[in-house]
Amino acid sequence: MKKGRVLVAMSGGIDSSITALLLHEQGYEIVGLTMKTWDYVSSGGRKKETGCCSLDSINDARNVAVSLGFPHIILDIREEFGDYVISNFTSEYLAGRTPNPCVLCNTHIKWDALLRRADKLNCEYIATGHYANIRHENGRYIVSRGKDLNKDQSYALWGVSQESLSRTLLPLGVFTKPEIREIASQRGFKELVTKSESYEICFIPDNDYRGFLKRRVDNLEEQVKGGEFVLEDGTVVGHHEGYPFYTVGQRKGLGITLGYPVYVTEIQADKNRVVLGTFDELARDGMYVHKLNMGKYPDLQGRRLDSVTKVRYNDPGSPAVLEQDGDIMKVFFGKGVHAIAPGQAAVFYEGDDVIGGGWIKASFKQPAFKKYNFSQ
């Protein structure tokens, strides 16, 4: 007896393919779906044979579906993707922030598009190949880290709504990547094991985001040229190529030599300035996070909550105290955290559970020990 009908997001890679395989073996009725989000070549890239949205990847997903005997469809969301994700990407850089398009796409494009199509196809559930887990507890759907901490993708799912989580299956969360490769080999999908994985942003040709911005924004270089590199005290030490071409924490590619290592510590878009400093000057003691989506706990108003907070995808996280003030989360770190970039996602953890997350609005220097005693 079938457990239910599931719409599986399939990129053609090993993770989403084995997601479909596992659910098929568990007795679900599967419909595979591949999203076309962007035309890589039209955005200035060389012909791309592999990776997200390529013809080869679509064919790979279809071949898995045919092999397992379930239907496969293609969903073209390029217009929606461009209107929301691409527009946000350019506007964030023009505002001096560093966007995270993959998290934004998960939250506002992919899940919504999957659920809308699932409804049309009478699918009770959707599924993806993320390495994370979801459980239902105390009336809440809680995202938690996957078994494979090296591949854990819970950070990317902080923005998915409770309603969406209630219909989401993540079968890879209880496996490690080597285990998934072994399953693929055992089930006759050895070609998936050797297929290269794409880690680039799907719409950035050859990882050249500067070139992408120049093509997307008319007269960008004219708008932002002639800006100043300054030190933390305001001393002008050089001229930069345009503030949108830099990000907080950047050291390489600055085109300036001061006799000691310097990093971008702040971007002042309104002044067309890029602030440079030492590694120590890059540290911040806290930050303000807005546009929150709370998971494990719906509201932290009036509470002080200990957490481990991540400020970027590959960040192991730092001990922090959370204080919610309306729609702003104040985050106080026990020790200085480096390269907190406005525009990136901040995700709050309690153990392996995602408490919630939001977008970094600003960071500040205010030693947390003046307010809290952190046990280290």
From Swiss-Prot:
Catalyzes the 2-thiolation of uridine at the wobble position (U34) of tRNA, leading to the formation of s(2)U34. It is an enzyme of class 2 (transferase). Pfam families: tRNA_Me_trans, tRNA_Me_trans_C, tRNA_Me_trans_M. It comes from the Bacteria. Disulfide bonds join C105-C202. It catalyses: S-sulfanyl-L-cysteinyl-[protein] + uridine(34) in tRNA + AH2 + ATP = 2-thiouridine(34) in tRNA + L-cysteinyl-[protein] + A + AMP + diphosphate + H(+). One of its GO terms (molecular function) is tRNA-uridine 2-sulfurtransferase activity. It comes from Amoebophilus asiaticus (strain 5a2). Belongs to the MnmA/TRMU family. Gene3D superfamilies: Adenine nucleotide alpha hydrolases-like domains, HUPs, Translation factors. Keywords: ATP-binding, Cytoplasm, Disulfide bond, Nucleotide-binding, RNA-binding, Transferase, tRNA processing, tRNA-binding. The lineage of its organism: Bacteria, Pseudomonadati, Bacteroidota, Cytophagia, Cytophagales. This is tRNA-specific 2-thiouridylase MnmA. The keyword ATP-binding applies.
